[in-house]
UniProtKB/Swiss-Prot annotation:
Pfam families, per the entry: Iron_traffic
Source organism phylogeny: Bacteria, Pseudomonadati, Pseudomonadota, Gammaproteobacteria, Enterobacterales
Family annotation (NCBIfam families): PRK05408.1
Molecular function per GO: iron ion binding
Record's protein name: Probable Fe(2+)-trafficking protein
Protein family: Belongs to the Fe(2+)-trafficking protein family.
Amino acid sequence: MSRTIYCTFLKREAEGQDFQFYPGELGKRIYDNISKEAWTQWQTKQTMLINEKKISMMNVADRKVLEQEMINFLFEGQDVHIQGYTPPSE
């Protein structure tokens, strides 16, 4: 059964995560406040960051950079900037 949360990213009620998949306090914050829809949007941005900035998930410093970008995107309203990327026009 799905659960509904108030998503702080989308600023509305939405379907919450099924379980806490990110560790620690940040993981609890994501589980409590970020919807599946918002998380999917982050995953798209994350993939772009990993590819364009050649981030290695084996490198602790790179993981910290990615985590900070995630916090900025999901909780602080800062969009991910990829140099040279132009989003498709609607």
